[in-house]
Every structure is written in C-alpha cells, then in structure tokens.
Amino acid sequence: MTDHDHFSRAGAGRESPLAPGLDPARTALVLIDLMERIVALPLAPHPGPEVLDTSLGLARAFRAAGAPVVAVRVQRPGVPEQPAGSGLVAAVGQAADAVVVKHTVGAFHDTCLHDELRQRGVTTLVVAGIATNMGVESTARAAADLDYRLVFAEDAMSALTAAEHDASVRLDFPRFGTVVRSADVYFAGT
C-alpha cells in the first residue's frame, strides 16, 4: 500500500465516505490556480499534467450533473505585466462556469467567489488545484470559516514537494472536511 492508497475507493468493497452522494444543486467544483506556468512546475506527488487531467475529469462530471465549476487564478497586484503562462490552461477556462481572479493566496479574500457561490445556492465545495498547501489550503480554510462543507479531491491537487502535499492532506484537511480520491466524488442518484 502506498502513502496515497489510504483514501476510500468507491467500488473497492467499501462505501464511499460521500454516500449517498453530493447534491448537484448545492455543490460546486473550485479549481485553484490551474495556470499554464503553475501546471508546468515540477510537482509532487502528482505531476501537473496528471492533476490537470484529473481536475478536467471532475469538471466534466460536474457539468454533466448540472453542478457549477469555478476556476480561480492568481494575478498579483502592483505587477503591470504578469509572468508568461499566467492564464488558465485553456481547457480549464472552457470548462468553467465562472472565473475568479484572486490577488492573494486564497480565493475568498477580496473576490466575488463567496457571492458567486451563494447566488447559486452552493453549500458544498469540492476543491482541487495547485498548490495543495498554498492556494488550495488557504481557500479551504476561508471556506470553512464561511460554513461551506468541504470535500478535497486528493489526486486532483499537488504541491512542490510530496511532504507539503501530505501534511495538508493528512493533518489539516481532515479537520475541515472529507478527503477522497476523485473517483469517489459522485452525485446522489448516479
């Protein structure tokens, strides 16, 4: 068993921790910083292209269920020209129902994210993206403070090191929500 095999797997003889499934009318997928230059970084434990593919798979499932997908990207204030590759990966932007531009590590501070989610009636967030211990965790902490139910798709996120990723996934995220593999994210009735 590898370090990442401890997460529940639907269809592996165990019930998903999300049973009986998520409500698509109350759930949104929030994708953090899936930008060209960030996805291209050397990441661990999941390579950037793998995180991207897994995140896009989640986005397809959310869109098929009628649940919103929100893509978040960072744009640092006071920097007249952002570094090359600062846009979202094109497929992420195309999959998103809304794009939120943040100016800090987390996606809620001084953005329209909370208002966007509340207008849609969202109470549960499935969070994915890069980096696990930075943008994902900062966003999750703020979401918890705002009383969102949180689900972390562990294989749809990564960090600069496996140790940083694992510290968030094993120590911090379970205090705020449920950590699962993306295969365990499903909607009620499916």
Regions flagged by a language model, labelled:
Residues 25, 43-71:
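A short alpha/beta connector and helix-capping loop motif
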Residues 1-28, 57-60, 64, 77-190:
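Active-site-adjacent betaalpha module
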Residues 30-34:
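N-terminal nucleotide-binding beta1-loop-alpha1 segment
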Residues 36-41:
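Short acidic, Gly/Ser-rich segments with clustered Asp/Glu that frequently serve as metal-coordination loops
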Residues 74:
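Conserved H-loop
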